[in-house]
Amino acid sequence: MSSSVLLKVYITPFADKGVGEAEKWSCDTAKEALNVVNAIWSKANIAFVINDCAIDKPLDIAKSARNDDRRLLDVLSLRHTPDNLVHIYLVNPIENLSAGGSSYVDSDPEPASFIQWYGNVDANGRAWAHELGHLMSLNHVEIDYANERQAALRSNLMT
């Protein structure tokens, strides 16, 4: 029997100086990516369910400030009332962000993640599954690529 985790998904487009950017995510693409997430996490008997999906008002933030993952996640999560769901923010691609998203179990006011758009369902879903791993307190797996046994782990979700 698998455990179900309810998600509240916000499709959050960006704006810069009042000029909105086209949304990359939609509730339909979120559902497609979540199918990839659930295929990955099914091995651990964990299923994620979108309880609610909403198109959020654009977040007006300069492009140069978007790659500060902690700050961005705090700004995103402070825009909404905390509840008993896991909040997921799906955002457009972010220039110079070194990761696919960010997650903080101790984010203010609640545990939350954001995932940037990669342009295809498999990459979007894998990045989302990775961030959910962080919300379940999983750390990155450090790999020594010179070690053949460790290098074989490069496809591990948490690398």
Describe the predicted segments one by one:
Residues A44-F114, Y118:
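Active-site-proximal segments of metallohydrolase catalytic domains
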